[in-house]
Amino acid sequence: MSKDEYLITDAPLKALTVFAMPMILGSFFQQVYNMADSIIVGQFVGSSALAAVGACAALTNVFICIALGAGVGAGVLVSRYFGARDYSKMKTIVSTSLISFLILSILLGVFGFCFSHSMMRLLQTPADILEAAVLYLRVYFVGFPFLFMYNILSTMFTSIGESKIPLGLLIFSSVLNIFMDLWMVAGLGLGVFGAALATLIAQGISGVLSLLIFFSRMRRYKSHFAWFDGRELRSMLRIAVPSVLQQSTVSIGMMIVQAVVNPFGTQALAGYSATMRVENVFSLIFVSIGNAVSPYVSQNFGAKKIERIKKGYHAALVLDLCFAVFAFIVIETLHTQISSLFLGKDGTTLAYEVSGGYMRWLGYFFIFMGIKMATDGVLRGLGIMRPFLIANMVNLAIRLSVALIFAPRFGITFVWLAVPAGWLANFLISYAALRKSWPAEKDKPPRERGL
């Protein structure tokens, strides 16, 4: 038995914990890097440059979601064939996905480069930072194939149980990016262009390293394979397309929520933004557990170990409960101190009220997010994508509708009141679909289980 197969052999709780921890650490490290990157640009170039880079964030997040969603489709099938020890089909999926998504990333990169100016104008970017934002975005799109490759291969690594390698590559990429930022922005004085170029170089090196390391891992599995298989591509797309739609739609939805918050003024926005950062940090834990569940489920599904899937799901719920209790205790006892980290002494009473109210409300209900993510992870792992997409769209619809309809009339509180309701509705729909589909479909071949 290969040591890579611990997801189908070790105790479910142990396997998921060992598998998920590098993913959680990697996500936290990414957050630390993002803050460091912003600090460097803001300190050495100025607030206008920081605003220009920040103005690109919403748009780049949509394209990142496309890369992540595409990786999900390939990752689920790689996990399944790995669990079944069908290495020929596994390597065919790897080759087919890399060829297909490389072509897609080049097309998207060319599109983004050519239409950067139009997209930033559509987002109503302020005129004084428009040119700097367009410059940053164009350099970003030049490196988009490397970003795509890195994200696809990170998913591939986790699909075969190798979650530590993406963590190492992420740490390397982040540290390299920070040093390149300092050199190009602070040392060479290249401004926004330097920040974008530093990101391009770091992602390029990480993407190539990912490819080389992954190919070396694939040599362990001796088997013949096809370089490209149209049927397997269709199977991937049945899983990838709902994931892309779900992730990109959520990013767009959060842009709309931001537009609802803006009219409440700078201090309300500051309080909301502070808690959004806290929400993002705690969310990383539950998202990482859900992402760990998918390859665990898919590998065991491929190995026909259905009972282990149930035990793994229950283990994920236990992990979610533990982290939800931890989050509640931290927020309930330290919410004022946490708010002050972002708001400082200049924060007004309104800013602290908004931040504290939103944060404590989330603390009560993070368990809903946890069980939603775990259940969604099982659905993805089994390839049951239609109810997964519906559940996530209902979640987003609840959050958006309450914010758009009630917040302008009755206050900013309604922006976050619906958040746990959306999580709970998402969980109930996903869980109902899981109970309905599991007994009838558990032995069907992968390509029958998409949209």
Language-model segments: residues:
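N-terminal transmembrane alpha-helices
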Residues: 7-44, 58-73, 77, 102-109, ...
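Interfacial/gating helices of multi-pass transporter permease domains
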Residues: 18, 41-61, 127-132, 192-193, ...
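Transmembrane helical elements of multi-pass membrane transporters/channels
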Residues: 18-37, 139, 173, 202-206, ...
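Helix-terminus/linker motif at the lipid-water interface of multi-pass membrane proteins
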Residues: 28, 32-50, 120-127, 183-190, ...
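Short alpha-helical transmembrane segments in multi-pass integral membrane proteins
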Residues: 1-20, 78-143, 187-241, 297-364, ...
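Hydrophobic transmembrane alpha-helices of multi-pass small-molecule transporters
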Residues: 62-65, 177-181, 206-211, 281-284, ...
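Small-residue-rich hydrophobic transmembrane alpha-helices
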Residues: 50-110, 147-166, 271-335, 369-383, ...
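Short runs within selected transmembrane alpha-helices of multi-pass transporters and secretion channels
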Residues: 71, 140-158, 166-174, 195-208, ...
